[in-house]
Amino acid sequence: MAYLHFSEDELAGRRQRACEKMAAQGLDAVLLFKQESMFYLTGYDTGGYSLFQCLIMRADGDLVLVTRSADKLQAAHTSMIPDVRIWIDKGGANPAHDVVAVLKEKGLAGKQVGVELHAWCLTGQRWDMVRNALDGFCSHSDATDLIQGLRLIKSPAEMEYVR
């Protein structure tokens, strides 16, 4: 059972607002790399914010987390993410291929995918891997502000939590 700082209803409302914003921007999915975005939408709390991990969210709210094996248990204990996929962290690994495999499985080939570009874990080298994997597979655009903008407006549950 996961320990969540906020109720599942609160998290579901956040994801619903994110999906509405995605629809308004013409996005079929987003690739979220910021730890704070993952926490905001799912409760996922990890110290691995500087390492490659990606929360994929389709416009219908479907979620998949692509992360290292070291973070699998953390995802289970701190989030409501139903589908956690592991990329193997070894020399020459390219987790962007794992992300694109999920996108393909989810029917997102040729679709519009937003990417949260301004994130600690998305270094220049890692962005090159992601961009090269996405190019020719789908259209992509910067969606850095998508979740960040939602986080600015606090819900009653958030206000109560900080009191």
Give the label of every model feature segment:
Residues 1-62:
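Terminal domain-start leader segments
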Residues 41-43, 75, 124-126:
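Short glycine-/acidic-enriched loop or helix-start segments at secondary-structure transitions
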